[in-house]
From Swiss-Prot:
GO BP field: proton motive force-driven ATP synthesis; proton transmembrane transport
A GO CC annotation given for this chain: proton-transporting ATP synthase complex
Gene3D superfamilies: ATP synthase, F0 complex, subunit A
Protein name in the entry: ATP synthase F(0) complex subunit a
Quaternary structure and interacting proteins, as annotated: Component of the ATP synthase complex composed at least of ATP5F1A/subunit alpha, ATP5F1B/subunit beta, ATP5MC1/subunit c (homooctomer), MT-ATP6/subunit a, MT-ATP8/subunit 8, ATP5ME/subunit e, ATP5MF/subunit f, ATP5MG/subunit g, ATP5MK/subunit k, ATP5MJ/subunit j, ATP5F1C/subunit gamma, ATP5F1D/subunit delta, ATP5F1E/subunit epsilon, ATP5PF/subunit F6, ATP5PB/subunit b, ATP5PD/subunit d, ATP5PO/subunit OSCP.
Native organism taxonomy: Eukaryota, Metazoa, Chordata, Craniata, Vertebrata
Originating gene: mt-atp6
Species the sequence originates in: Gadus morhua (Atlantic cod)
């Protein structure tokens, strides 16, 4: 019995083993691996085409040094996309609704882009804290604001992904519960509510794909500033 709407976001366990580990391993089992054959199947061809188009669009503004990140970000994109889509299926735990997981992905990758900027172009990286032509009276305030803006980036990355997916799951839960309650009393209203639930589910599919893309896009923009 569900005691709270947020019980669906608690990490279940089986025989003392957290099921979040199985949920994190599931995308790597579902995504087909390329083969050495001349002619691959349709799924592998579609996957290769999608990754190639995504990588070209994402790394076109970056210089050659930033292209080293292409395998990592493309793999992370497929990983997040698969987790988000699987989370919309019934009785499947969604790891990306956990802020700890999202921050665990956002903070190290953001920190890596900052350290790369400090190593490759320290003058340019430190110049973001104090733009040229700043009045002397505003220098301390501006440095504090730029520092806060820099350190809030990974928090915004993790919270954005968590909040969007959590809100969508809660809405689906509420509307589906309303359909079951209204079905015996007002069937017509229940059918209309079910249609609304179907439209909301389609919207959540789009949100799941968009949020995975936005997460990687923002990381690439942070990388573009420092590479």
């Amino acid at each position: 019995m569900t005691l709270s709407l947020f019980d669906q976001f608690s990490s279940p366990s089986f025989l003392g083993i957290p099921m979040i580990l199985m949920a994190l391993a599931l995308p790597w089992l579902l995504i087909p691996t390329p083969t050495s054959r001349w002619l691959s199947n349709r799924v592998v061809s579609l996957q290769g085409w999608f990754i190639a188009r995504f990588t070209n669009q994402l790394f076109l503004p970056l210089n050659v040094g930033g292209h080293k990140w292409a395998p990592l970000l493309a793999s992370l994109m497929m990983f997040l996309l698969t987790l988000n889509m699987l989370g919309l299926m019934p009785y499947i735990f969604t790891p990306t609704t956990q802020l700890s997981l999202n921050l665990g992905l956002a903070v190290p990758l953001w920190l890596a882009t900052v350290l790369i900027g400090m190593r490759n172009q320290p003058t340019h990286a430190l110049g973001h804290f104090l733009p040229e032509g700043t009045p002397t009276a505003l220098i301390p305030i501006l440095i504090i604001m730029q520092t806060i803006s820099l350190f809030i980036r990974p928090l915004a990355l993790g919270v954005r992904l968590t909040a969007n997916l959590t809100a969508g799951h809660l809405l689906i839960h509420l509307i589906s519960s309303a359909v079951f309650v209204l079905m015996p009393m007002m069937p017509v209203v229940a059918i209309l509510t079910a249609v609304l639930l179907l439209l909301l589910t389609m919207l959540e599919v789009a949100v799941a794909m968009i949020q995975a893309y936005v997460f990687i896009l923002l990381l690439s923009l942070y990388l573009q500033e420092n590479v």
